[in-house]
């Protein structure tokens, strides 16, 4: 880790990372990262990791119904720009930006993270309302590219849970899953040893650490913790070919994908390598796109 980052682990297993950073001024970025996503879903929960993410904005112990969004709007924050979340195969991350010039704003921000970590209420009325929102997100995402990827992923992720755990899930489960099935995922996987609180911004790091310890120290995991299922590695059994078509596709894509060993980004050197690789890919893409725009393009 960068020496300026303060890392700690609470007795309950929750990890926190604190980095004082004075640009932009008077701003604090607060994240809650959960080491669980759609890969951890049971067969009757496909799509519910993402649904759980939605429910975090629909009522908690301190902030009933949509009070989180309404409160943040009163201090100048906007949903989407300053308040957001996302779910992937392996993680669920909540992101919050608050002004740091007044202590109560940061305290409220940490209260929100604490409620997301262990006190989402799952009001049956709110669950019923949010089903339609999640189903509409599923419907709007069912374009040609998504349909092609769904087919391609069966080959790409062959032999692993990734092939059967696309994050948006299955509409019939989203539509019919009982409230308790949705809540079961939350209780199984939103537990301290699978969580990290990340605070970066223009604040006193000692005060921030004290407030994190005070708020998150009482979090408890389930009495009987489940073993966390991993996605597993796709089977590497020679060359596999996937040819997929869709009548609504607007172009042709040819890709070559290689299975390589995971390389963690655990140091500045690792991060520098990652940035260099990303820049290489961007430069190559721009050059190919520039060639493609020419009237005498060779492809």
For each feature predicted by the language model, list its residue ranges.
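An aromatic/glycine/proline-enriched structural segment found at the starts
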Residues: 159, 196-251, 263, 290
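Soluble periplasmic/extracytoplasmic beta-strand elements of cell-envelope proteins
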Residues: 15-19, 29-33, 93-97, 196-198, ...
């Amino acid at each position: 880790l960068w020496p300026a980052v303060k890392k700690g682990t609470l007795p309950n297993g929750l990890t926190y990372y604190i980095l004082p950073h004075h640009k932009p001024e008077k701003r604090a970025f607060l994240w809650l990262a959960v080491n669980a996503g759609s890969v951890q879903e049971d067969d009757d929960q496909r799509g519910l990791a993402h649904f759980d993410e939605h429910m975090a904005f629909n009522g908690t112990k301190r902030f009933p119904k949509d009070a989180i969004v309404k409160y943040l709007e009163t201090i100048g924050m906007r949903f989407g720009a300053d308040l957001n979340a996302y779910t992937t195969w392996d993680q669920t991350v909540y992101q919050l930006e608050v002004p740091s010039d007044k202590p109560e704003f940061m305290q409220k921000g940490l209260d929100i993270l604490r409620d997301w970590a262990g006190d989402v209420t799952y009001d049956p009325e709110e669950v019923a309302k949010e089903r339609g929102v999640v189903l509409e997100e599923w419907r709007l995402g069912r374009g040609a590219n998504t349909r092609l990827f769904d087919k391609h992923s069966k080959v790409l992720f062959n032999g692993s849970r990734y092939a059967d755990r696309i994050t948006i899930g299955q509409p019939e489960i989203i539509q019919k899953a009982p409230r308790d099935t949705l809540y079961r995922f939350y209780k199984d996987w939103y537990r301290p040893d699978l969580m990290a609180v990340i605070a970066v911004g223009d604040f006193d790091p000692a005060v921030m650490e004290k407030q994190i310890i005070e708020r998150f120290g009482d979090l408890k995991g389930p009495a009987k913790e489940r073993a966390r299922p991993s996605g597993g590695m796709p089977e590497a059994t020679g060359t596999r070919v996937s040819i997929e078509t869709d009548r609504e596709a607007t172009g042709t894509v040819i890709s070559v994908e290689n299975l390589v060993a995971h390389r963690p980004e655990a140091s500045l050197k690792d991060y520098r390598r990652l940035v260099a690789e990303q820049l290489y890919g961007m430069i190559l893409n721009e050059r190919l796109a520039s060639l493609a725009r020419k009237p005498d393009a060779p492809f």
